[in-house]
Amino acid sequence: ERKIPYFYRKLASIETAVIKTIPLVSIYIPAYNCQDSIIRCVESALNQTVTDLEVCICNDGSTDKTLEVLEEHYTDHPRVRFITQENSGIAKASNTAVNMCRGFYIGQLDSDDYLEPDAVALCLREFFSDRNLVCVYTTNRNVNKDGSLIADGYNWPEFSREKLMTEMILHHFRMFTIRAWKITTGFNETIENAVDYDMYLKLSEVGKFKHINKICYNRTLHTENTSIKKLD
C-alpha cells in the first residue's frame, strides 16, 4: 500500500489524528536541572489539540533529578523519547534534540516553560496555508514559577527581516520546518550567547516567516537558564 507523505496530510484531520510511525510534528526540549518543571513542560506538549506529535528531550547532563523524573514518567511513553548527554550547553543540547526529531514541523520548547493547548494547531494552519513558510511564531506571556502572570511579552506586530537584523523579535512559541533547518548549519555550538538569534537569522535566509498575534506560550522568568554549560 502506497503511503501519502506525511507533510501532505489534510488539515482537517490534524486535530483528531493519532500518531503514525513518522509523526507530523516534533516538539524538542533541551533540558537542564529542571526536575520541578519538566513534567508540566512535557505534558503541555502532549496535551496539544494536535495529537500527531512526538516529544524529543535532550537531558544536558543535569545534576538534579531531571533524568530520574523522565525515567519514572516517560520511559514507556509512546510519544516521548529522551536521551542524556554530558553537559555541553544549550546549542549542542538543542542540536541533539532536533536531530532526534522525526516530524516535518519542529516546535521549540524550553524545559521550564509550557504551551497553551492550541499552539501547534495554530502554527500548522499557517504552514498549511502557505508552503513557502519556513517558520511560524506566536506571542508569549511571562510568568513566575507558579504560573502567575508577570506580564504579556513584548509583541512586534509583523515579521520584518530588517528588524530581525537589528534585534531578536521572534517570540515563543516557534515552529520551523525540518527541511529548512537542515539547510542551515543548525545551532552554533561555538557561541554561548544569542544561540537562538543566530539560528533564526540563518533560517530567515531560507524562506518566509509568519507571526501569529496570539499568546500561545508561557515563559517562566527566573535566575536559572534552561541549559547552561557548567563553569569549572
Model features per residue range: what roles?
Residues 43-52:
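Short, acidic, metal-binding catalytic loop of nucleotide-sugar glycosyltransferases
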